[in-house]
Amino acid sequence: MKLALRVAYDGTAFYGFQRQPGVRTVEGELIRALTKLRIIENPEENDFKGASRTDRGVSAFFNVVSFVPGERADLAKPEVLNHHLRDVWVLGVAEVPDEFHPRFWARGKTYRYYLVDEGFDLETMLECAKLFEGTHDFSAFAKLEPGRDPVRTISSIVMTQRGGYYVVEISGESFLWEMVRRIVNALRFCGLGLLEVGEVKSMLEGIYTKKIPPAPAEGLVLWHIDYPGIEFTGDGRGIKKARRDLFERYSRALTRAALFGDALLEL
């Protein structure tokens, strides 16, 4: 038997998803809780795998890990695990085939970036967004790793205005390192008049002298991963702690935003 967990986390509390010596990571926090509860003995023996290795500061509402459970498989449920985790919440569990791999079985991902409105020209940003849709070489909009194919397919980019900020939702089959954050910054630069739409088109055609830098990691969240035929289930008890923790973070952030907003008005 193999289990998969749907997990959410506050990326600002970690040095990224992947385990690293001497720093706190999402993967490390999950493995700590799973081994403490004797759900697994160690990540290698129990075939622990993750779907997306998000960078430091990047959050997730839907990431997935899988493992072969040990003697206490009965404890691998949200209502138990969430009492042993900090800044990470298990939102669902699914029994999956033995050959399941959370990275390679994913059929698509959706990211959301939360972008404060700086007086953008929305029409220009939407024109720029359309250029990214489809299949392109994204070398100019990624931090390339040796041997990785820079060609990717973006199925859609949707921008939604909510009060004083925009939600930029980007969906595709797979993404390169920092690709979403660099696309968002390209949209931002176009919206501010710092970059021409024609320049973005040229960059996608391989004509450029410098790359677009990534937008800050804190605005990005891995929103959804598509696994056809797999359903993650959890009950109200398991979600209760996640909801309470998220509301506390929301309340603190809103208080700080109000404080700094009033300070700006006085300057």
Regions found by a protein language model. Name each.
Residues M1-L267:
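Structured-RNA-binding interfaces characteristic of tRNA pseudouridine synthases
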